[in-house]
Swiss-Prot record:
Keyword Manganese: yes
One Gene Ontology molecular-function label: phosphoglycerate mutase activity
Descriptive protein name: 2,3-bisphosphoglycerate-independent phosphoglycerate mutase
Gene: gpmI
Keyword annotations from UniProtKB, A to Z: Glycolysis, Isomerase, Manganese, Metal-binding
Residues at which substrate binds: H118, R147, D148, R177, R183, R248, S249, D250, R251, K320
Binding site for Mn(2+) 1: D386, H390, H445
Broadest EC class assigned to this enzyme: isomerase
Cofactor note: Binds 2 manganese ions per subunit.
Pathway(s) annotated for this protein in UniProt: Carbohydrate degradation; glycolysis; pyruvate from D-glyceraldehyde 3-phosphate: step 3/5
Source organism phylogeny: Bacteria, Pseudomonadati, Campylobacterota, Epsilonproteobacteria, Campylobacterales
Active-site residue numbers: S61 (phosphoserine intermediate)
Protein source organism: Aliarcobacter butzleri (strain RM4018) (Arcobacter butzleri)
Function description: Catalyzes the interconversion of 2-phosphoglycerate and 3-phosphoglycerate.
Amino acid sequence: MSNKTLLIITDGIGHNSSNKNNAFYTAKKPTYDYLFENVPYSLIHTYGEYVGLPDMQMGNSEVGHMTIGSGRVLYQDLVKIHLAIKNDTLKDNEVLKNTISKSNNIHLLGLASDGGVHSHINHIIAMAKIAKNMGKKVFIHIITDGRDVAPNCAKTYINQILEICDEDIKIATISGRYYAMDRDNRWDRVKKAYDSITFANPKTQDDILSYIETSYKNEIFDEFIEPTSFEGYNGIEKNDGIIFCNFRSDRMREISSVFAKADFNEFDTFKGSLNFASMTQYDKNVFIPVLFPKDNPKNTLAEVISNAGLSQLHTAETEKYAHVTFFFNGGVEEPVLNESRVLIPSPQVATYDLKPEMSAPEVGSAVRTAMNNNIDFIVVNFANGDMVGHTGVFEAAVKAVEAVDFELGQIFELAKKQNYNIILTSDHGNCEMMKDDEGNILTNHTVGDVYCFVYSPKVKEVKTGSLNNIAPTVLKLMNLEIPKEMDEPLI
């Protein structure tokens, strides 16, 4: 019996007992249909306390891949920061105090929603109050969400921030996350957000609520709000402090590097000295003091396989590449010994509903090449269900599922010939619930379970569990010892 194992993560494809507004159900998916009839599977948890998040908090790709790759429940940053605010210890954080005290003015940049995937509005509000109490002027640079929450609810969150605004706390700029939180090297987008924050360019005469209302009338919703600054804000000045409030790293790497990377050269930047701090480490190659350093787990799945002298391949397209590498490996950037990586570029389109197959064919091809080369362990992420699900376009999400299903069919056929075990699961759901009961478009992740198929002659039954049970399941299939840090397998 072969020990070679393939772990497939179909991002954003979850279980929904209702067929209504369910792109996964609607899609023509012969591979999944075959699996449901012939391969053992169970439903596993991806959210809340099962993955180290607050109770009933939706899961996300960072947390999901960290949990899958480490094989245990990790206390997530959202929970750590919530507790620091609740216990009134955030104000005592040395990095935060030092950054505020040595800066002239404080600029807070963060995603202003309670989605809890990249940030939380309460963190921004708490830091604004702390900086004000330390005698500083505070400028808040709002990034609107529309993706991890409803597409047009920004005013709800902005009103919460307006409640704390006074002579010392001001909303300075606004930008949709499409611009400020790009992660695909679309520097033209990032520049628009950067210019509004740094140079107060452009500037609108509207107040923030009127600006949003005008955007809505023009069919521009929260994710895509055009960056602008507001009256009374004139830009960043020498010796100001910038605090990046998002705790998730992947969508803060670009915008933070523009400010903090000495040799950044994609476009013209502010030349004066500035002070920086970030909630977590975004990029080890760009020095920014960190409020909440990560505790990297030991004996991750990648490490155990490497220590056994076996080969492994991690592959995904750009949008999810960090997840199968950095996050999957427990927050470690460098590959382990005998780990190879294949990055497939994501298509250069404005939004992925325009190309719902994304780069799935190329990703699938990379997997099949690795299988033909008899790589001992392969992990792959298919991004379509999540990235197209986030657009809210139902028909495109259906096509996204169909594109993934086609690639799965080819992979499973080859698995039979090459004697691979396969675990097929997801990090969280999305496209299986595209509207709520009132008919409102949903673009966020779902709070629910996902499928976990285990295709192997060794397996007749799959237990229920959570994402933390995946890594030990891989190791059991590969006939490797499960380290004491990991939880129980599903088989």
